[in-house]
Amino acid sequence: MVRPAAARGALPAVIVIHEAWGADAHIRDVAGRIASAGYLAFVPDLYAHGGTRPAELAPDRIDALKRFADTLPPGGLGDPEARRRGLEGMAETERERIEESRRAVFAGIKNPDRFVDDLRGAVDRLLDHPDCNGQIGTVGFCLGGGLAGLLACDDGDVRATVAYYGAPPPAARAGTISSPMLGIYAGKDRPITDTVPAFADAMAAAGKSFDHRVYPGAPHAFFNDTRPSYRVRASRDAWARTLTFLAEHLG
């Protein structure tokens, strides 16, 4: 956990939910920025279920997968033909390690229930923490953006939800969402962004608060300033909206 060094007393808490790359240096840096804005920031490592990451999700293996992804077209990790071409010429052991890590990452994306359970545990931990004043929000990115929305469907203790370019919850679940929600989306991020209008309509019909912004021309992961996808102007605007939203709903 991270908190402002000079702050006194209990603070609102924000759970920072990591991308598919895990709780890496970028996510820890984001947590530091949130703490600097006056919050208790907590980054659960969802890949370390039970306290230890499996070998295929170890940081060095994830870094190798990132480097491989950077050699592919956008979305290439999910494209079998693009992966096949990218893996050509690699040693067999290296190919196997990259594919093993990719399968592990995508398994979590496709089956998020365990991660949501772990996030409920993170909420409970914060509610019992002396540095938390009981006001809890989430800010999630990519995989974590989708998880933030799912957590809001199931946990009434979450008071504010910010989802960066994560798939919204199913429209049928809009009525179960307990907190106001801010969605940050990328124009060049189909099919995720294509699902936003139906979700927005469902939230409005259910009387729920859902503010959202789609950044035209921005790719998935445009906020990650360690990746080629980073876009400065979209990131500046999205971050300003995020801090305003957290201040409004968490104090």
Language-model regions: role of each:
Residues M1-G251:
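N-terminal cap/leader regions of alpha/beta-hydrolase-fold enzymes
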